[in-house]
Structure formats: C-alpha cells, structure tokens
Amino acid sequence: MSEILCQWLNKELKVSRTVSPKSFAKAFSSGYLLGEVLHKFELQDDFSEFLDSRVSSAKLNNFSRLEPTLNLLGVQFDQNVAHGIITEKPGVATKLLYQLYIALQKKKKSGLTGVEMQTMQRLTNLRLQNMKSDTFQERLRHMIPRQTDFNLMRITYRFQEKYKHVKEDLAHLHFEKLERFQKLKEEQRCFDIEKQYLNRRRQNEIMAKIQAAIIQIPKPASNRTLKALEAQKMMKKKKEAEDVADEIKKFEALIKKDLQAKESASKTSLDTAGQTTTDLLNTYSDDEYIKKIQKRLEEDAFAREQREKRRRKLLMDQLIAHEAQEEAYREEQLINRLMRQSQQERRIAVQLMHVRHEKEVLWQNRIFREKQHEERRLKDFQDALDREAALAKQAKIDFEEQFLKEKRFHDQIAVERAQARYEKHYSVCAEILDQIVDLSTKVADYRMLTNNLIPYKLMHDWKELFFNAKPIYEQASVKTLPANPSREQLTELEKRDLLDTNDYEEYKNMVGEWALPEEMVDNLPPSNNCILGHILHRLAEKSLPPRAESTTPELPSFAVKGCLLGKTLSGKTTILRSLQKDFPIQILSIDTLVQEAIQAFHDNEKVSEVLPIQKNDEEDALPVLQEEIKESQDPQHVFSAGPVSDEVLPETEGETMLSANADKTPKAEEVKSSDSFLKLTTRAQLGAKSEQLLKKGKSIPDVLLVDIIVNAINEIPVNQDCILDGFPMTLNQAQLLEEALTGCNRNLTEVERKKAQKSTLAIDPATSKEIPLPSPAFDFVILLDVSDTSSMSRMNDIIAEELSYKTAHEDISQRVAAENQDKDGDQNLRDQIQHRIIGFLDNWPLLEQWFSEPENILIKINAEIDKESLCEKVKEILTTEIAKKKNKVEKKLEEKEAEKKAAASLAELPLPTPPPAPPPEPEKEKEIHQSHVASKTPTAKGKPQSEAPHGKQESLQEGKGKKGETALKRKGSPKGKSSGGKVPVKKSPADSTDTSPVAIVPQPPKPGSEEWVYVNEPVPEEMPLFLVPYWELIENSYINTIKTVLRHLREDQHTVLAYLYEIRTSFQEFLKRPDHKQDFVAQWQADFNSLPDDLWDDEETKAELHQRVNDLRDRLWDICDARKEEAEQERLDIINESWLQDTLGMTMNHFFSLMQAELNRFQDTKRLLQDYYWGMESKIPVEDNKRFTRIPLVQLDSKDNSESQLRIPLVPRISISLETVTPKPKTKSVLKGKMDNSLENVESNFEADEKLVMDTWQQASLAVSHMVAAEIHQRLMEEEKENQPADPKEKSPQMGANKKVKKEPPKKKQEDKKPKGKSPPMAEATPVIVTTEEIAEIKRKNELRVKIKEEHLAALQFEEIATQFRLELIKTKALALLEDLVTKVVDVYKLMEKWLGERYLNEMASTEKLTDVARYHIETSTKIQNELYLSQEDFFINGNIKVFPDPPPSIRPPPVEKEEDGTLTIEQLDSLRDQFLDMAPKGIIGNKAFTDILIDLVTLNLGTNNFPSNWMHLTQPELQELTSLLTVNSEFVDWRKFLLVTSMPWPIPLEEELLETLQKFKAVDKEQLGTITFEQYMQAGLWFTGDEDIKIPENPLEPLPFNRQEHLIEFFFRLFADYEKDPPQLDYTQMLLYFACHPDTVEGVYRALSVAVGTHVFQQVKASIPSAEKTSSTDAGPAEEFPEPEENAAREERKLKDDTEKREQKDEEIPENANNEKMSMETLLKVFKGGSEAQDSNRFASHLKIENIYAEGFIKTFQDLGAKNLEPIEVAVLLKHPFIQDLISNYSDYKFPDIKIILQRSEHVQGSDGERSPSRHTEEKK
C-alpha cells in the first residue's frame, strides 16, 4: 500500500519532496505535503499560507487549515488523527493518505470543484463545521506542545542520554578500577606466597647445610672389630688392585703407541725405498722425476718433525696431568689429616659459620628494609611534587580561564559602552539630519512662496532654531494652552521664547533687522546710562543681606598640594612610595585614612586640654555637617575604597543615619556617653560614623570622606607638601573637596554673580568687571593613563606572582597565614576590577573638565612604561610644580609689599582741594535762555538726537506760550524736509560749559564719566525695598512688551508671504479656468468634415466655409474678451480688499506699541530717579497724580474697539476709497481707469499712513522733551525757594515762563510749598549764632545739593537722548517696513496685470492660428482628420485623435505550399498520417492492406488531393512494387518509413549529426526517461533548421514563401510521437533509428547501432570491402535512373559519397580501443526490431516466429560469448560473432527504398503515350 501511494505521489502528482515508504510518516508529519496534494487538486486555496517547517507553530497552522478541506472530502480527520500524524505514529499517515486517495478519485470522477462542493453543503452543516474547526484548533493546540517545550524536552532527553552515557562510563571505570584493584591484590598475594616459599626454602637449605655440617663420629670400639679390619683389608686390597690395573692399562697404552709409531716409520721407509728405486731407475730419463723425489723426501722429513713435536707435547701433557693427580692426592690426604680433629672444634666451627650466616642475613634484610624506606620516601616526595605540580597546573589553568572570562566580560562591557556611544552618536546625527531635512524643505517651501527671495530675517530665525536643536516646523498649537501642556506645546513655547529673546537682543543692540541706517550711525548715543546703573547696583546691594568676609591667610604657604589619579593598578601607590623616598611629602590615601579614623575611634583618641575651644566648634559643626550631608548626598556620587563596601547608600537611609548621629544618643556599646563622644578627636568621631555605616552594610558618603581628607590635611604642617592617592574619584567629591579647602563654590559664585547683576538695561561699569575666581584647591593633578587591558594584565600578573610564591617551600604556618591574608584581597581585587574600571571611565570626563577649568592643572602621563621611567617622569613633574609654586608665592609677596608701599605714600600726600563752587544761578539761566533761543529754528526730520542736548539746556523763559510753535517746528513736512531748508548749528552740553566765565579753573568731570565721584549719601531703608522691585517691574514689563510686539511682527511677516503667494496662485488658477471654445471648434470641424465630396471645389461652398470660419473667429474673440473682463474684475476685487489696509494698520499699531513701551520706560525711569534723589536729599516723595502719556493706536474698521477705547485712545485712518469716487460700469475703459485709480489709492493711502507715523513720532518726542523740561523747571523752582537772597527781578520772567509751559505747575507749587514751608523759621533762628563749622556744613550741603542736581539731570538727559534715539529708530523702521509691504503688494498687482495681458494676447494669437489652419484646408479642399484642439491659450493639432477612421489596410495572404516534382505537401503528409494512424497505431500494417489503401487513395481521388499529380497515374503493379520496397519480413509495411521517404527532400543526416542530435535530446531529457515533449523537441532541434534566408516579397498582397523545412520538423514530431499520452511523448531513440536508414544496407545497420549505443561503432575490416562495393553500386543507381531533378540527385550522390568516404576513412583509422562500449540484449532487440513490432497484430504467427528466432539467436550469441545471465557485452566482441555478422549483412530494414524510380518510370510511360487528363493538366498549371 505504501509503495502504491508513494508512486502516486512521486510520479503522478510530482510533489515537491520525494516520498519513500521508510520516511512516509516523517514526510507527512508537518502537514505541508498534505496541503500540497490538496492544492494540486485545487481544493486548498490558502496553500501559500502553509509553512514548510517542522516547528510546532507550523504544524498547528498547517493542520488547522487542512481540517475543513478534509472534512469537506468526507475523510475521517480529528485531533487524534492529527496528533498521531504529528507524532509520526506508524500507519496513521498511510491510512489517512489512502482515504484521501479514494476521496480524491471520487471527486475527480464527479468533476466538482472545491467551491462547488462547499456551496452544495447545507448552511447548518457549514456552521457546525466551523464550530468543529474552532474546537479542533483549540484541542490540537492543547495536544501539541509548544516548540519551546518541545525543544526543552529534546534538550532534556539529550542530556538524559548524555547522563546515561556518563553514568555507564563511570560504572565501567569503577568496574575497571575494581578489577585493577583485585588484580593488584592477587599479584600481592602471589608475591607474598612466593616470598613465603622462598623463605621456607632458604630455611630448609640452611637446616640441610647445618645437618650436613654435623659430623657423625663413630664409636671407637667399632674400629677394632674383625669385620671392620677385614673390610679395611679388603678395601685396601681392592684399591691396590685397582691401582695396579690402572698402571697396567697405562703401560699397555704406551706400548701400543710405540708400536704404531714404529709401524708407520717402517711403512714410510719402505715407501721411500720404493720411490727411490723408481726414481733411480728414471734418473737418467727425466729431471722432473728427480725433483719430485726430492720434494717428497723433504715433506717426509717435515712430517717426522711434526710427529715428534706432537708426541713430545702429548707426553708433557700426560706428565702434567699426573703431577696434578698426585698433588690432588696429597691435598686430599692433608685434608683428611686436618679433619681428624676433635668433635668440639668442628661443632664450634659449624656454629660460628651459622652465626656468620645469620649475621649476613640480618645485614641483607636491614639493607633491603633501608632500601625500601628510601624508595618509599622518594616515592612520597615525588608524589608530593607531582601533587603540587598538578595543583599548580590546575591553578594556572583556573587562573587562565578566569582571566579569559574576565577579559570576555570586559570586552563585552567595552562593546556595550561602544554600542551605547554609537547609538547616542547615531541618534544625535539622525536628529541633526532630520533638522537639516526640515530646514531644506522649509527653505524650499519659502522659495516657492517668495519666488526664490527668502527674507534675511526668516533665514536667520531658522538657523537659530537649527543651531539650538529646535524643530523648525510647528509641532502643536500654543494659542490656547491647557493646564498641563503637552511636550510638543512646551517645545513650541521654547521655540517662541528663543526667537523672542533673539529679536529682543537685536532690538536692544541695534543689529540685524534693527541695524542703524547710515544717516543715524553718526549720532549714536552712549549705550549705557552709567548713573542709572550705579543707582540700581547700590539699591540692589542695600536690599541684599550683608556678606560674611572671607578670611584668607596673610602669608601664602609654599607647600604644594596635588593628587595622583588613575585606574585601578595604574601604579599610583608604588609611584608615591618611590617619591616619598626622594621628597619630604605626605601621602594621603583614603583607605588608610578611613582605617586610621576607625582605629582612632577604637583607641578612644581624645582631644588634649590645650584646645578647649575646639569642643564647642565641633558641636556647632555637627548640625552643619548634617545639613551638608543631607544636601549633597546623592546615590550616584558615593565612593567606596578599600574596606568600604561597594553598595550605594540610599538618600533616605543616609539622612536617617546622620540625623540619628546628630540628634539621638548613641548606644552604650559603641559610645558610653555624649560627653565622652564629644571629647573624642575629629578623626575619631568621623571614624565612629564611618564604622556605623560600614556595620550596616552601607557605603561612606562623599561628605564624610571629604571631612576625613580635610581633617588629615589640616593636621599636616603648613609648609609640608601633601599628595592624595587616588582621590577624588567623582565630580561630587572634587567639588566638596575644593569647597572645603578653599571655602568657595564655583556654582554658587556664578549664581551670586548673576543675582548681583539685577538690571540688563542699565549696568554699573564699576561692578560689571568680572571677579577672578579663586585659585583651585590643588596645585597639580597627575593622571596615570593606562588602558583597561594593561590594568587587567597587571592584576593577573600580581595574582600569578602570588600563586608562584605560594608554591615555594615555606613553613606551613606561614603559608596558611599568607593564603588566608591574600585570598580576600585577591578576591576583592578580582571582583571589583571591572566595576572600578567602569566607574573611572564614567566619572573621568567630568573630572577632566573640572580640573581643566578655569585653570588647567591636569597633567597626563602614559603609565604603560617601566617603573623606573615612570618614577623619573613624576619626579620631574613634582620638581617643576614645586618651583612654580615657589615663584608664584614670591610674586604674590612682592605684590603685597608694593601695595603696602603705595598705600603708605598715598597716606603721606596732602588731601586734594574740593572742586570750586558752581557759578551763580542767574548765569545758568542766561546760558539756558541763549541755548533755547538758538533752538527756535526748525530742525530737519530724522535728527532727534540733535534736539536732545537743547532739551537739557532749555530754560523756563520759553513757557507755555511757545509749546505749539515748537511742536509745529518739530513735526516738519511729511517727507521729513525742514521748512527753511537749513540746519542751524547747535551746541552740546560740553559747549555750554565751555562758555562759562570761569576759565582759570580746570574743567570738572562730567556726571557718569569714570572720573566722576557718585553721590553716596544714605537713603531711607524702606526705599531700596520699594525701588528694587519697582525697577524689576519696569524692566520686565518693558522686555515682555518688546518681545510680544516683535513676535507679532515676526508672525505678520509669515502671514504676508502666505497671503501674497495665495493671491498669486489663486489668480493664476482663475486665469486657467476652463472655457467652452473647444466645443465650438469641434462642432465646426464636424460640420466641415461632413461636407459632401462633390462640393469641395465649389467656389460658393468655399466662400460659405470662409464665412463660417469668420463667424467662429468672432465667437472665439468674444469669449476671450469676456474672460479678460472677468479676470480684470477679479484683479480689481483683490485690490479692493481691505487686507492691505488692515495689515498696514496692525503693523503701525505694533510700532506704536514699541514707541509706547519706550515712553513708558522713560516715564518710569524718570519717576525712579526722582524718588531716589529726593530720598537722598531727605525729601518726601510727592505722589504723581498725573497719568502716563499714551500714544493713540490706529482704529481698524473691521473690528469693534468700543472696549479698548476706554484704555487706549484711537485715531481714525484717512483712506481714499474707490467706491466713493466711481460707480461700477462694465466697460473696458472704465475697468482700466478703475484699476489705475486703485493703485493710486494704495499709494495715497500709504502717504497718509506715513504722515500718521510721523505725527505719532513727533507727539511722543514732544512728550519726552516736555517731561524733561518740567523736571528741570521743578529743580530750578526748588533752588529759587532755597536761595532767598536771589534777585526778584530775575524770578519774574521765570514765573511768567512757567505759566506758559503747563497749567499744572501752580498746583504743584502749592503742594511743594506745604512740606517746605517749615524751613524758613529754622533758617531765621540760626543767623544770630553762626560758627565756622556751621558755615562749612552749610557750604557742604549746598555743594552736595548742586552735585545731586547735576547727577540727577545728567541721568535724566541721558535717558531723554536714548529714548529720542529709540523713537526715531522705530519711526524709521516702521516707514521702511510699510514701504516694503506696499511695494510687494503693488508688485503683485502689477504682475497680475502682466499675466492677464499676456494670456489675452496668447488666446487671440491661438485663435488666429486656428483660422489660418482652417483657411488652408478650405483652399486645399481636404478634410481635417486629426482633431483641432483649442483650449485657453493653447492651440495644436492632436495627432493622437482622429475624427474619422482611416481606410482599412491590405492584408497579406497566408503562405501556401505548392506541389513540386511529385513531392507530397505537409498537408498531404498529415492526411496520410492520420489515416494510417487510425488503422495501425503501432506503425506496422500488412502488405495487402497497405496496397489497397494506396490504390483507393489513387483511384478514388474525388477532389481530396491526397497525392500529387504524378502519383495519380500509378498502376496497381507499380503500387505493389512500391509496397515490396517497403515490406518488412515479406508480410508487413512500416507506414512511418513510407511517410519518411515520401516527405523527401530533406537533409539526410550524417552519423555525427545523428549522434549530436541524440545528445541534444538526452540533455533536454533531464529525467532520462527516453521520451520528450514537443517543447523539449523544439528546444533541442534537429540537425537542420528552417530556411532562414526567406525573401519577403515587396508586394503586400503577395503571400510569404512557404517554409517547408520548418514545417517538416514539426511533422516529424507528429509522425513519431505517441498521442495516447498527455502531453504527447516522443521516443527520440526510435525516431533517430528511422533516420539512420541509408541506401547501403550494412551502413544503415551500423548507423543504427551507433545511435543505439550513443557513440560511433566501427565496422569490421572484413566487412568493409563488400560494403564499399554495395555502396558504390547503390550510389550509382540513382545517378543513372533519376534524370530529374539533376541537382537533387547530384547533391544526394555527393552526400552519400562523402558519408561513405568518411566511413571508410574511419574504418581504416580504427583505434585500438574502438568498439569498447557495451551493448545489452534490449538495445540489440531495439535495433533489430526484437520486441516492439510484434505488438501490432497478434494474428500473424509467422512474424512472431521470426521475432522469436531473433531473440533465441541473440540469447545463444550472448551465451556463446560468455554472458550466461545476458549481461551487456562489448560491441567489438559482439560484432565478431558469425550470427551477428550474418544478420548485419542480410538485415534490410535500415535501407532507404528508392521510390523515385517508380515515379519517374510512370511519368516516362505517360509522357510517351501522350495521355493526360485535362483536369490533371489544370491542376498542374495551378
């Protein structure tokens, strides 16, 4: 079942993943393949949502989507089935797939789609199914574990398996250990047994030796018995007999030796004698014989000598042996004699020997035991060394691992810090980039609004916002703010305040938009009122509480104070220790100081009685310390060092603890009583507080640490240098330490300096100079700069040295003590190193900035060098700093000495004389009168600063009567020109003083100058408390008013730009509004084109058409005129809007508000000066009932100002309205005049507004001048009252003048006389007793009064000058702004007029162009096919639109194939293929049936056109002959081969081309199925292609030439394809076997074999000659018998000859390894039709018999060649078999039949007879 399903899935459905029976459950466990199967049947529309994953979420998703579809198909599927499939339960997936297969087959048979199946369900069932699906999803979600749980289970299982393996390994190791132990135990037991056995054996040997050593002494009586005597005699006899026998044997042996020697000698003598005789006989015969005899004699003599030597040697050996035997006998006899001793001696000897043996054994045992002990000691020592080495190695490994872990942790922290810095930098850059983009878009927007001319003010404001990181675009509306504004609204408020402040600074400093014009630059007044600034500064000092004077030592100390900072382990302490050896410095370490303070508390260190005052000071300092701790304690600035804990002290806990220390009584265990605690030293008290904090597990706060440091510094002698070690470490500690050492706080100093400068409008130059900051607490700060890696490596080096030190041989107690002591320190160092480095990196930037400002005392040193070099560098720096401090102190001492000397010299000089008295009052009045007379001439407009000095000297003689005249003169003309045209020369105050009659006295200093001494008389205490808030109110109201007005002006600028852009764009849109001209043009064109063709040349018709064109032109011109009038009216409406007047009125009101603010400030300042100087003169200030002067605002017509009229006076605007002058006619001339009048009205209204601004400015200027004149008059009246002896003649004109100036002075005089009326009686009482002291006092008071008056009037006149200058500047800017606004608006109005005129002219021109085109077509009598488009000012001929269609184009007929030379067309070939395919689908048909079909097609050709004309004359014998050529095995015909032959001509392929085509097909057939589709067939192609050089005929009505070869390629696929499959499949190997046919039979077979094998098959040498002959004979046949066509015959002949020559050349050049390819039985049967053709018809038994014969022959051949199991055989071996050779030479299926012979013969016979049917003749003509 699984295999069937797998075949269904893999082959039929072709799923994305190959499924096998083994992996069936796993493949479907995710549900993805199930969704794919349903998707292929178009049932799963949401297959794209499926997830091809094995996670739980993917499975849940897939099965949730599968459940509705499976239930729709009727497959049983629930959560249990889904769970079984997911858990890969065997058989569940197979069962579901089988049910699904059955359901899908049913669905396929029914032909219903998924949508149709869903619609066929009932609604209730559908709802129920949806509920089931939801329930299914919920239950499945609970059943399937989450992926995290699954992963956890998998990890747990994996670790359980690992635990099992580890446990098994441990058990195995334990078992091996037990076995090893048992084996060792057994070996030990065997060794003990062997040892015991050896000991027992040794003991037995010793006992045996002892037993053998015991001599058994026989009894004495036994030697004397008869038997013993006889035995002794017998023994003696026997011995003697044996001796005799031995002697006899020896003697006989000697005799035998002698006899043998004699016999040998006799033999040799005989031989020599015989030889000599023979030699003598032959002596005379030959000399050689003699030589031989002589030689033999010599050899015999030599042999005798050798024998004698041997005999002698033998005798000597015997003699020596005999002597040795005798010697042994003698020794034996001697031993026997020696052994004949007593039994006691022998026993003693045996015992001694035994004792000696025992001693030797004991000695050996002791040596063995000592050796064992030595080995054991060596082994123990070596074990200890190995154990220590292993421990050291393990410690080293642990240390390296810890180092790597810390390094990774540090790298991770560094990466996080770098990432944080990067993110911060990235966010800043992104914010800046966003602001740049906003600025760019804002600029682009306003370039569009302002026509690329952005105002400077706008660009300046945008840049300010950009530089201050404020958003340029509006974030939220701030018009109505809620109670809790949002963040965006707060940002908008900040933006507004920033721009307001910038505008105010520009206004105040007269820069930017408020820069002075060229005509006002020369008359610029002083920027500051020094007198007013001095007054305000004095009042502010009076209002502030008195300061505590700072106590500074008179003589500075030469001691140097510094600190050495750096990271942990940067070498601070080491460097300071080395410095302490060379310099007398005191090193202060916070760790040591804290420990000493705690130790002092434990030691009860008490204050000595010499300083009893210190107790009270400490008691007072405790609450102060408590408050400081509460204020400065911050969790972020808590430092811990050494024993101090790293935890941060919370603020509340710290406060509670410190308050408890200050208020509550300590416990009895810690401090016995409060008195005893207060008797402790400061260090002990600080140590007590530190210990309390540390016991609670808290950190010591910075305040306590700083107190400990300061206490230690105070205990150091004054002239001794001190350096802090690693302190301070945070900015808070540095601030607290500097404040404790210097008594100054930088932040508080800045705040106090800002508070002291109360005023921004008036500054006291004497106090505005910057106060130098106090010198820092340290003279230098040295930073030892090391990297984090160096710090950590140093820590590791220290720990490594300690580890190596531990491994050295030490005393055990010392080692344990060192280990316990260093372990905590190392652990603390290792634990805190990362936090310390991070803390230093976090705090150092702030500390670096602190030590670099205001005086840079920071010195950085690279500490990553050796110790000696670093010490030298620090020594050089310390030496330099000591020298600097010494020079600095000496310089200070020299400065103090110089100051003392200067003070002493000044004290010795006489006091300077007081300044001379002022001139008498009448002279002053004359001067004032003269100067005022000179000012009666009119002044030019725009020069108010020239009038200000005259205001100072104006006398009271020109009173009320001349007010109007002066006002008229000051107003001048509206254009600013004077009436006389001349500017009189005016005198300044300096000039008036120069005219003084006293010329001898030097010129006194002017009030407000640097030489002027201000009046510092005491003022009432209540006055500063009132005047300081009053001035703050003045200043704040002035600044707020200015900011508000400037803000409105800024906002109005945006409004103006937006409005001007809006009216420009709206007017342009109005000009572009649609018109109806195109409708008239289209109607005219339709009428024009609808004219009949016969009327085009008629003159009357043309005249009528011209008239119609004129009518159309007039109508279009009327439309243009109407549009022009509407546009002019629209422009006039825009001009007549009240926007410009309202905007001008609002702008003037804003500038009038600025004037009002300046006027208010002047009035308030005048009142403040008056109150101040009156208070200094001890006068009672008079209440000013007069209301402040108000500048009227412009009344706007569009607003209701009834309410505001009660507060601010309004003046009406005089504007010229166009509606009051002209009515509203609609003619063009009236509109033109109306527009001109509108522009003139705009200009005239602007002149009226300009005059109104000038009048307002003159009114404000006059008000200021009158107030100053009134103040001067009041001062003169007071002086007249006080100077009683003055001349009454001089007073009368002054009184007359006062009446003319104002109406109110009489009332004031009455009020002033009331308080001053009491003074004359006092003056009258004193003249009787007048002393010199009183005269001097009166004189001093008069001088003081004159000085006060001068100072008061100078301050007031300065304010007048500044106010007049400000008012004129406001007037100038107002006129310039109004003029600029009117110019912009008028330019826009003129631009609108320009646009209107240009558009009207363009519309008229386009109408003229249309008229010209129409007249041209009328004259040429042609229709206008393309649309004429006229819209607004555009006219063109639209080539994309035609008003009537074009005539249809001529269509080229399709190509038609013609009959040529009896060749069948493609259509005829397809017709024959269809008929043959219906009768014989397999390609084989019987001979008779084939002949009958051809006869029927030829004879019964009733218009079917199945064959060409020359085929129609074939007779039955000729058709039978044709059949015989195609016959296979004498009974069958292959109709495919017939169609292949009849489709000629086509290029006959060479063998190489066939093989190349085969490789192409195999390359396309990726699955190597042997079949391809039509697309793959066309992609691969054949050895020939279609005709590419087809000529396209020029005549479009002529058809294209027919491409026969292209259609032949498609026909070959249809011919050989199997259409029973869908899509049709082509067996390309079978097709190429057909194309392998050749005129030569043998050649065709070899070509077929090459195609079947896939490579070239070489022919055998024997078969090459006959095949060549056959080829030549067959090649010659067509050339002779085919006279027509000659070209085709010649081409085919050449091709066949070339093929034959190549074959012969290949056969001649057969390589050695040719035909090594193997051929199987199936391939052989395919080549020789061994199993495919018998399937066509089963009724032909003979055919089956033949096929069976081939198969049996092939089997026998394979068996003969050694292939028992029919395995493939090499082609070379196969071709050598006779059966194969015979079959190749006789097989004729691969021979090309030549049917052209029959056709040519038929034509020849028909031509000779001359018989042709008329129908055929006509067909041939066609």
From Swiss-Prot:
Return the InterPro entries for the record: CH_2 (IPR010441), CH_dom (IPR001715), CH_dom_sf (IPR036872), EF-hand-dom_pair (IPR011992), P-loop_NTPase (IPR027417), SPEF2_C (IPR056199), SPEF2_D5 (IPR054517), Sperm_flagellar-bone_growth (IPR052634)
Single Gene Ontology BP annotation: spermatogenesis
Question: Where does it localize?
Answer: Cell projection, Cilium, Flagellum; Cytoplasm; Golgi apparatus
Q: Specify where the region named Disordered lies, as residue ranges.
A: 896-1004, 1278-1327, 1664-1718, 1803-1822
Q: Give the domain of life.
A: Eukaryota
Q: Where is this region: Interaction with IFT20?
A: 1324-1676
**Bias (Low complexity) ranges:** 975-987
Where the record annotates domain Calponin-homology (CH), the positions are 1-105
Q: Where is the composition biased (Basic and acidic residues)?
A: 921-930, 949-968, 1278-1292, 1303-1314, 1688-1708
This protein's record includes keyword Coiled coil: yes
Arranged from A to Z, the UniProt key words for this protein are: Cell projection, Cilium, Coiled coil, Cytoplasm, Differentiation, Disease variant, Flagellum, Golgi apparatus, Spermatogenesis
Q: Which GO terms describe its cellular component?
A: cilium; cytoplasm; cytosol; extracellular region; Golgi apparatus; manchette; nuclear body; sperm flagellum
Q: What does this protein do?
A: Required for correct axoneme development in spermatozoa. Important for normal development of the manchette and sperm head morphology. Essential for male fertility. Plays a role in localization of the intraflagellar transport protein IFT20 to the manchette, suggesting function as an adapter for dynein-mediated protein transport during spermatogenesis. Also plays a role in bone growth where it seems to be required for normal osteoblast differentiation.
Its assembly, as annotated, is: Interacts (via C-terminus) with IFT20. Interacts with DYNC1I2.
Clinical disorder: Spermatogenic failure 43: An autosomal recessive infertility disorder characterized by asthenospermia due to multiple morphologic abnormalities of sperm flagella, including short, absent, coiled, and bent flagella.
Q: What is this protein called?
A: Sperm flagellar protein 2
What organism is the protein native to? Homo sapiens (Human)
Q: Which gene encodes it?
A: SPEF2
